[in-house]
Curated annotation (Swiss-Prot):
Keywords: Oxidoreductase. Its EC number is 1.8.4.11. InterPro entries: Met_Sox_Rdtase_MsrA_dom, Met_Sox_Rdtase_MsrA_sf. SUPFAM superfamilies: Peptide methionine sulfoxide reductase. Signal peptide: none annotated. It catalyses: L-methionyl-[protein] + [thioredoxin]-disulfide + H2O = L-methionyl-(S)-S-oxide-[protein] + [thioredoxin]-dithiol; [thioredoxin]-disulfide + L-methionine + H2O = L-methionine (S)-S-oxide + [thioredoxin]-dithiol. Pfam families: PMSR (PF01625). Belongs to the MsrA Met sulfoxide reductase family. Transmembrane segments: none annotated. This is Peptide methionine sulfoxide reductase MsrA.
């Protein structure tokens, strides 16, 4: 994997703590950074983003090798971490800072995301329409260090949150099997 061959992908799917591990454990992923994007405040803090005044959403920025793990596969992994029918947040986390968004970095990513969204919507997997936003990637601001790799640093807290938030049960009911 050379630096020249790497690309970026950015996904928002509720609490960013829960969005790192599913990507971080895939082949061809160089790094996954938790952060904020899509808003108007420069270098926002976690507290500011949670206040709902910045316009940002919690997201992960993934640096990946498309020859090893193509963008299409990243989008598949993304869908399986989210409730794509809920535009007002994800699971217990509500509000714009937790809204589901696929942020595309180029036209190819936009087309892949749009096609994948349409296919998921047409699949009949969900009774409600797929409402995940697809938007142009903007400046990404890394979150504070204590948020990075949370699933590794705070394993028990992370696993408890996955269950308590309702995310784990939703994934089991809608994406497994």
């Amino acid at each position: 994997m050379t630096k020249e061959s790497l690309e970026k992908a950015t996904f928002a799917g509720g609490c960013f703590w829960c969005m790192v591990k599913p990507f971080d454990t895939q082949p061809g992923i160089e790094k996954v950074v938790s952060g904020y994007t899509g808003g108007h405040t420069v270098n926002p803090t976690y507290k500011e983003v949670c206040s709902g005044t910045t316009g940002h959403t919690e997201a992960v920025e993934i640096t990946f090798d498309p020859a090893v793990f193509p963008y299409e596969k990243l989008v598949e992994v993304y869908w399986q971490q989210t409730d794509p029918t809920d535009a007002a947040g994800q699971f217990v986390d509500r509000g714009d800072s937790y809204r589901p968004v696929i942020f595309y970095h180029n036209e190819e990513q936009r087309q892949i995301a749009e096609k994948s969204k349409a296919a998921l919507d047409a699949s009949g997997r969900f009774k409600k329409p797929v409402v995940t936003e697809i938007a142009k990637a903007e400046t990404f601001y890394p979150a504070e260090e204590y948020h990075q790799d949370f699933y590794k640093k705070e394993k028990a807290h992370y696993e408890g949150y996955q269950v308590a938030s309702g995310r784990a049960a939703f994934i089991d009911a809608n994406w497994k099997g």
